[in-house]
């Protein structure tokens, strides 16, 4: 089941922490913003997105909410 969340990365430190958490996951995650899709574990990819607004994060597996809670705005849906 795919989990989709909207998150906000407000600062450079938020991006660094988010990438670190994504690198610890045993599965991949993708970040979507305005038609672009990047790997959540790639810091340069994230910085290429418009981070002034929420971005959509898509996970291929269930995740531990404690890892993502600081960035979460709202849960969109499960697919």
Give the ranges of each region predicted by the language model.
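Short, surface-exposed connector motifs at secondary-structure boundaries
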Residues: 1, 25-27
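Short glycine-/aliphatic-rich beta-strand segments at the starts of folded cytosolic domains
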Residues: 1-8
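A structural detector for beta-sheet-dominated domains
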Residues: 8-10, 60
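Amphipathic alpha-helical interaction surfaces in cytosolic regulatory modules
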Residues: 12-25, 36-51, 70-71
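C-terminal structural segments of small proteins and small subunits
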Residues: 50, 54-79
